[in-house]
Regions:
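Transmembrane helix-bundle core of multi-pass membrane transporters
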Residues: 133, 137-202
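Hydrophobic alpha-helical transmembrane segments
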Residues: 19-23, 48, 55, 77-81, ...
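Hydrophobic core segments of alpha-helical transmembrane domains in multi-pass membrane transport
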Residues: 21-34, 62, 87, 116-119, ...
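Single transmembrane alpha-helix segments in multi-pass membrane proteins
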Residues: 31-35, 39-93, 128-135
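Membrane-interfacial amphipathic/re-entrant helices at transmembrane-helix boundaries
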Residues: 2-59, 95-110
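Alpha-helical transmembrane segments within multi-pass membrane transporters and channels
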Residues: 94-145
């Protein structure tokens, strides 16, 4: 009986140790909810999940690096670079100040494919530097962070990018069954990563 209690105590202690951050976040959420009852309102929860969804997708991308004891400091800058590219490709035809005046208005899926392909090349460069040149991930991605930031500034000239395709901008406001599209995208990406990590040889 005592051995069982000790085993259960160790299991509980190990679980709490492995999930300390989650427990702390839940505790903070409960405290904020008690202080501000409107915090748990449906509207606020939807807005909260909508704002977190983009960061959640970035975190999922970095999770693979962390699982393999690596890191990726360039993810934040790369997300900003992706946003700049997406806005440039999503500009409407004939818009004033258009980066590529002769380029027709691209559909949203085409914009996504182009941006993902370009950012994948940057990620491939990170992987090659770490794997073949044996540079520490911290150093390699820190350098890539600055490179991406510099390219973004030079490419856009620090100017605002406007006149975007309405089908592209509607992603931030449209809903499906009352749930914002951004949240659905985050859930789909999360499902893909779950499948990768749990059902594929590479993930396991």
């Amino acid at each position: 009986m005592e051995a069982t209690k000790k085993l259960n105590g160790k299991a509980v202690g190990k679980w709490l140790s492995n999930n300390a951050i989650i427990m702390m976040m839940l505790a903070i959420t409960l405290i904020v909810g008690i202080i501000h009852p409107n915090f748990f309102s449906g509207t606020n929860m939807i807005n909260l999940f909508k704002n977190v969804s983009i960061r959640y997708i970035i975190a999922l991308g970095i999770s693979g690096c962390l699982i393999t004891t690596g890191n990726d400091l360039s993810a934040g800058r790369l997300a900003g670079f992706a946003a700049c590219l997406a806005c440039i490709f999503a500009q409407t035809e004939g818009a004033s100040g258009k980066f590529y005046p002769n380029m027709p208005t691209l559909s949203t899926p085409v914009v996504f494919i182009l941006v993902i392909a370009i950012c994948a090349i940057v990620g491939l460069c990170n992987g090659l530097v770490v794997s073949y040149l044996k540079v520490q991930p911290f150093i390699a991605t820190l350098g890539m962070q600055q490179v991406v930031y510099g390219i973004c500034l030079v490419y856009t000239g620090g100017t605002p990018i406007g006149s975007l395709n309405k089908n592209f901008t509607s992603l931030a406001s449209n809903t499906i069954i009352g749930v914002p599209v951004l949240i659905w995208i985050a859930l789909i990406v999360a499902g893909c990563f779950w499948f990768l990590y749990n059902k594929t040889r590479h993930g396991k």
